[in-house]
């Protein structure tokens, strides 16, 4: 059976056909509409899936935000242009006339990355550092989603009580500091208004402020990982996302994590499936996991 997998992120929408063998084909992308209106996202999703839906027997969605009863509830609306709520499953069933499931994107990616691990691993945490910071937790070989879909939203744990206000309403969240949006928001002077990609480029060219912003993000993530180790005693942490997979970033996180006491050290791995983990995880869950 072929799954039409969809990944909804703060920057882009992706879709692909994934067979029972896990092979990805006909992958497509569109920019995520920066709009508060549900119609904008519906129209973008329609354009994304219309060339693919005739070749699939079901739909699996991995989306940013809390997924509850098939709907997207934005924990940080800024990541979706201010959109607060969207009926994901209902919309895709109407667009495709196919059975549809939905799950948080980082939870889906965690499940895909867990399948790729070697050895006897039952406890792992996945962290995505991208437009926002999200996560997924596998414990006892099972993916944790929680009764309300909130499990794994580790980007909204406290990093700095005097830090910036996060889009979720809290102050000093990891996401407000370490994410691509957080990196860009802290830029000043000639870097003011630059996006995270530009800041990484400037850091590679030796720009001191850009380097400091990236170090601030990596240091914040390392402290989060130490907290995660203390909370879950996980065997490894897998890092993905456009920031998490940026050249040199994971090495910086490892450097800062090494400065923590030894009890909080844990193996860090780059995401095996890179930017396709959410698509694959959603398809895998559609094949047999009860959500």
Curated annotation (Swiss-Prot):
GO terms for biological process: N-acetylneuraminate catabolic process. It is an enzyme of class 2 (transferase). PROSITE patterns: ROK. The keyword Transferase applies. Belongs to the ROK (NagC/XylR) family. NanK subfamily. Homodimer. This is N-acetylmannosamine kinase. It comes from Escherichia coli O139:H28 (strain E24377A / ETEC).
């Amino acid at each position: 059976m072929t799954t039409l997998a969809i990944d909804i992120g703060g920057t882009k929408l992706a879709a692909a056909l994934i067979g029972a063998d896990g092979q990805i084909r006909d992958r497509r992308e569109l920019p995520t509409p920066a709009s508060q209106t549900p119609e904008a996202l519906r129209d973008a999703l329609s354009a994304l899936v219309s060339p693919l839906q005739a070749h699939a027997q079901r739909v699996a969605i991995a989306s940013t935000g809390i997924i509850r009863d098939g709907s997207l509830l934005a924990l940080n609306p800024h990541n979706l242009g201010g959109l607060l709520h969207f009926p994901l499953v209902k919309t895709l069933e109407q667009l495709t006339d196919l059975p549809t499931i939905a799950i948080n994107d980082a939870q889906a990616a965690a499940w895909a990355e867990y399948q790729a691990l070697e050895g006897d691993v039952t406890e792992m945490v996945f962290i995505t550092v991208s437009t926002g910071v999200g996560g997924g937790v596998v414990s006892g070989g099972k993916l944790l989603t929680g009764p309300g879909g909130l499990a794994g939203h580790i980007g909204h744990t406290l990093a700095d009580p005097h830090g910036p206000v996060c889009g979720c309403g809290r102050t000093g969240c990891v996401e407000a500091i370490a994410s691509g949006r957080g990196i860009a928001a802290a830029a000043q002077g000639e870097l003011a208004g630059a996006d995270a990609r530009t800041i990484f480029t400037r850091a590679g060219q030796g720009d001191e402020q850009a380097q400091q912003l990236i170090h601030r993000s990596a240091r914040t993530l390392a402290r989060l990982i130490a907290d995660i180790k203390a909370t879950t005693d996980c065997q490894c942490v897998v890092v993905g996302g456009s920031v998490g997979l940026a050249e040199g970033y994971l090495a910086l996180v490892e450097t800062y994590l090494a400065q923590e006491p030894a009890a909080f050290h844990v193996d860090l791995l780059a995401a095996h499936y890179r930017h396709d983990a959410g698509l694959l995880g959603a398809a895998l869950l559609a094949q047999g996991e009860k959500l």
